[in-house]
């Protein structure tokens, strides 16, 4: 699949890099998960991949860490990276 990166996702990644809250390893795990999704392979269950509900039901979430969540959707042939952040950051923006 081809990847589309939302402007919000780019801003979120930059914010999280600057925060110092996430390690280089965390970003490597994120990259690995994105590659796995792009290749349409199953994501390891430890990352708790699940669909969102309600008005966000077209999106899915993956927990990179317990409180660092990737929000994305698949619209073939695209994998759309929508946003990333903590629960409050992500779900506040989804409303």
Label each residue range with its predicted role.
Residues 1-66, 75-80, 88-95:
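Basic, Lys/Arg-enriched alpha-helical interface segments
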């Amino acid at each position: 699949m081809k990847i589309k990166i939302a402007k919000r996702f780019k801003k979120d990644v930059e914010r999280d890099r600057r925060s110092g809250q996430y390690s280089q390893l965390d970003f490597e795990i994120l990259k690995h998960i994105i590659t796995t999704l792009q290749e349409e392979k199953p994501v390891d269950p430890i990352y708790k991949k699940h669909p969102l509900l309600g008005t966000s039901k077209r999106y899915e979430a993956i927990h990179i860490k317990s409180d660092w969540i990737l929000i994305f959707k698949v619209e073939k042939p695209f994998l759309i990276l929508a946003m990333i952040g903590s629960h409050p950051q992500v779900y506040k923006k989804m409303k």
